[in-house]
Amino acid sequence: MEYRTNNVPVGNETKSAALNALPKIKISDSPNRHHNLVDAFMQSPSYSTQPKSAVEPLGLSFSPGYISPSSQSPHHGPVRSPSSRKPLPASPSRTRDHSLRVPVSGHSYSADEKPRERRKVIGNYVLGKTIGAGSMGKVKVAHHLKTGEQFAIKIVTRLHPDITKAKAAASAEATKAAQSEKNKEIRTVREAALSTLLRHPYICEARDVYITNSHYYMVFEFVDGGQMLDYIISHGKLKEKQARKFVRQIGSALSYLHQNSVVHRDLKIENILISKTGDIKIIDFGLSNLYRRQSRLRTFCGSLYFAAPELLNAQPYIGPEVDVWSFGIVLYVLVCGKVPFDDQNMSALHAKIKKGTVEYPSYLSSDCKGLLSRMLVTDPLKRATLEEVLNHPWMIRNYEGPPASFAPERSPITLPLDPEIIREMNGFDFGPPEKIVRELTKVISSEAYQSLAKTGFYSGPNSADKKKSFFEFRIRHAAHDIENPILPSLSMNTDIYDAFHPLISIYYLVSERRVYEKGGNWNRIAKTPVSSVPSSPVQPTSYNRTLPPMPEVVAYKGDEESPRVSRNTSLARRKPLPDTESHSPSPSATSSIKKNPSSIFRRFSSRRKQNKSSTSTLQISAPLETSQSPPTPRTKPSHKPPVSYKNKLVTQSAIGRSTSVREGRYAGISSQMDSLNMDSTGPSASNMANAPPSVRNNRVLNPRGASLGHGRMSTSTTNRQKQILNETMGNPVDKNSTSPSKSTDKLDPIKPVFLKGLFSVSTTSTKSTESIQRDLIRVMGMLDIEYKEIKGGYACLYKPQGIRTPTKSTSVHTRRKPSYGSNSTTDSYGSVPDTVPLDDNGESPASNLAFEIYIVKVPILSLRGVSFHRISGNSWQYKTLASRILNELKL
């Protein structure tokens, strides 16, 4: 359901009737906690002082800072009141908006009624092209209306309680589906709450969160370097020196998360992006949760290739040890170019992971092998802690010490607690503010906390205590295992600033965010106790920063029955979006990569091995729209220019489990291309694929013109905003642009690439653009890749005949069906039965790969390069296919 602007005035009678129609259920008394998310939010103190708009059939409310529907702009959706907030500065490095807003949602158009505009505006953000689609939702590129800055907006569909009730009453199968959707929404709320609190140089930063009656909109910073996966595609493997830089940054981010009682639980190559500066950014906290050292988490989730053995064995876990295993898999992939455990048969793959036997290539250094052998240990009690990993000799080689966690300086929390901070500690299932105060006071008053607070013990990342030898950590770890064979060493609380308690961690994070918003230095914000009540009243903000509260339950339970794990090879809990479809492979289609079916990080051919790689490779390309366009009275342009190359943003993995997309099925390529919203008047991709080579070779790329943003921009604010809108929404800005259906002898201008270390030898060439283009068309035809011409390259669709054949196993621990109806399974801080089937990253044989290939120009060197961008589909099939294309291109 697309977001549309509501321009219809609403009377008081309509408001009253609609509001009275909402169910009024107290959170503590409701057996169905999910149904109270919207009601509880509307009844919150910060919301009740504002007028309420009419509630549409799916429920509707709007928060402070947004004017009434009758006075909204007809083209720009919800408009912020001029007096509600200070203008956003041009550079967002200092101030950002962390509040969760509920802007006015659009009304549903009748069959005869058509919208005036296709522009979609959420707050101050103009939504543009879809650059990633998955089972969780989609990611769109967006521009800020005032500053023109680019952002990534993650859009997650939500369900209304009435719809959920209707499904639950239909059948037992529908009840399971409804329960799955409830759990999904609660995880989304938790992700939104976490994303707005975390602030680390190697974690993708969230700027805003909006909710409507049908969607969550999470606004993230724009990461313009592409996926780490594309880095691996170009290089095959990295030198240890180069891998060490990335690994230290990943370790720094994990250290920050773990110190704040957060476990990621879905760390993998697809969830690591690379910025233009060459630094990594970790994304996707959809499966993250808070952990407590004395409790156990019982949600078995993640991606199979990166999942720890205890998850496959359905064993409760604390949290950080799961991230350490995934961290080890990521390190292995970086230095070896493939995963350590792989098999075509699903049961055999499970057995390999549980056994944990790893083969190390001979070219790895002894230190690197030693580190991997400590991380990839099947027994979590014997596995290295993150502290040990960060102090390993391989990790600190050529550096002064272990990577810093960038955790700010903190002081012990003292009573009384700040009520403003307490009110913002929502979204984590802590309960109402009264309960949070009661529980937090109990923790602060405990003997353990007071004892550590008095001693002033602090083992910060830069302190002398942390700079000890690797062998000291090994000895201490082993001794503790002997003394406490049941609990690993990370279960001891020896630092009140290092994951002492989830309530403590979130209190710190909220306090630090508040200081940061006021202009403080976030790395030095806690020199005074953070809990003292301010002497002067806090100035009220003009927006609602209250997240929808999580359901009220008794938390901190860790002895419940473990949930089952799905036998499905994807996250079946995610319902496919209505605008995300796929089609079965054609019987005539042949898979040219079937020879290497399960190779997900295969080494490249011997020809590529002989080539020397340059420093690094990043992937950039124009985004591809995946949502179906609503009917519009306007005539569609003959083509849609992609946004600027700077718009290359959070990849498809940013919107959920990157390879767990359960898509529908199509009849053919035309439907697929329509669903990807690639409008063109030229011949269809299927026709071109079947056309004679002479015809295909005559197809040329479209002129890019001014749509890429490389031309001179007008100094007028009006013209500037108009250009931003045209660029974002794909409207043509150059009337003289050549139609895609035209074939000319002159090649179109090629997108220049300025990212550091973008390409390797295997992805660049001194060949002319025409030659590379002809080779691309030849290779795509040879590999049965259906393609359609877009600006600067091709939008491609590959229908594999079978990459992986999942087989059922009789093993007790083999991916059992999740028990959606059970209420006895919970994480220590997840009241939801947070049962998430493990994603094995192996889509069904009928799953399709949607991706883009661009011909780009490498500046200064007068070289041409090929850039890939995955839209949807299995990451590892994509990696194998991209490697095959590069091999056949013979650049």
From Swiss-Prot:
Keywords: ATP-binding, Cytoplasm, Kinase, Nucleotide-binding, Phosphoprotein, Serine/threonine-protein kinase, Transferase. Residues 842-891 form the KA1 domain. One of its GO terms (biological process) is establishment or maintenance of actin cytoskeleton polarity. InterPro entries: KA1/Ssp2_C, KA1_dom, Kinase-like_dom_sf, Prot_kinase_dom, Protein_kinase_ATP_BS, Ser/Thr_kinase_AS. ATP binds at I131, G132, A133, G134, S135, M136, G137, K138, V139, K154. It catalyses: L-seryl-[protein] + ATP = O-phospho-L-seryl-[protein] + ADP + H(+); L-threonyl-[protein] + ATP = O-phospho-L-threonyl-[protein] + ADP + H(+). Pfam families: KA1, Pkinase. The modification Phosphoserine is found at S535, S536. The active site is at D266 (proton acceptor). SMART domains: S_TKc. Residues 612-629, 649-659, 669-699, 728-742, 820-829 have a biased composition (Polar residues). Residues 125-395 form the Protein kinase domain. Its main location: cytoplasm. Its EC number is 2.7.11.1. Residues 529-538, 583-603 have a biased composition (Low complexity). Residues 65-116, 528-699, 728-747, 805-841 are annotated as: Disordered. It is found in: Cytoplasm. It comes from the Eukaryota. One of its GO terms (cellular component) is non-growing cell tip. The modification Phosphothreonine is found at T528. Belongs to the protein kinase superfamily. Ser/Thr protein kinase family. Has a role in establishing the characteristic rod cell shape. Important for cell polarity and is involved in directing growth to the cell ends. This is Protein kinase kin1.
